[in-house]
Amino acid sequence: MSVLVITGTDTGVGKTVATAALACAARVAGIDVAVCKPVQTGTGPAGGTGDDDLVEIGRLAGVDALHPGWRYPDPLAPVAAAERAGAALPTRDELIGMIRAADAPGRLTLVEGAGGLLVELGQDAVTLRDVATELAAPVLVVVAPGLGTLNHTALTLESLAAQQVPCAGLVIGAWPAQPGAAEIDNRDALARLAPVRAALPAGVGSVSPVDFERISATAFDPNWLAGLL
């Protein structure tokens, strides 16, 4: 299996845009790529206009192999969203099964989590870290550039190391057009914690798909991309 799990140090750090950028870069590089979103909250009522991260990823990245999982209307943590919907969370076996079903020989399968690494995604308090552990998959961590990011990032990396889950590196999800001293210093400090694979421009998720492809295609080291397979 060639599965890469993508998490974030916090909500709103740019995880979905980073997933789309990586999927786009892989596609441009000629890699067969699929994207899974096992658990999505905030989808709104049926037929409404709630969040749909996979639709946004497909629009930006030009990727068709999109695999949705369990969806809940309220924009809450999965446990709370499932409770409010009167619905069950998936079991560990169901989570693992959907990801394995999406994967294929020669394919890179990206798995975007919901929230951070230790957010409960499934029954019996199953987290994204548990999923990565069972799949023996590395984890790419999307981070913020501003104050507080060093502590948040270090805690996430420490949590991965505690279960011997390899970190595939960091992506800065929204690099400002005019970074201040904090952002510049933090970028250097983040690189000492783990390799920074990309620093995506703030607002890149709002550009046209053509511009998104141009930016994404050069955001990641092609040798690193090829090594994900």
Curated annotation (Swiss-Prot):
One of its GO terms (biological process) is biotin biosynthetic process. The gene is bioD. ATP binds at residues 12-17, 53, 112-115, 201-203. It comes from Mycobacterium sp. (strain JLS). This is ATP-dependent dethiobiotin synthetase BioD. Pathway: Cofactor biosynthesis; biotin biosynthesis; biotin from 7,8-diaminononanoate: step 1/2. It catalyses: (7R,8S)-7,8-diammoniononanoate + CO2 + ATP = (4R,5S)-dethiobiotin + ADP + phosphate + 3 H(+). InterPro entries: DTB_synth_BioD, P-loop_NTPase. Catalyzes a mechanistically unusual reaction, the ATP-dependent insertion of CO2 between the N7 and N8 nitrogen atoms of 7,8-diaminopelargonic acid (DAPA, also called 7,8-diammoniononanoate) to form a ureido ring. One of its GO terms (molecular function) is magnesium ion binding.
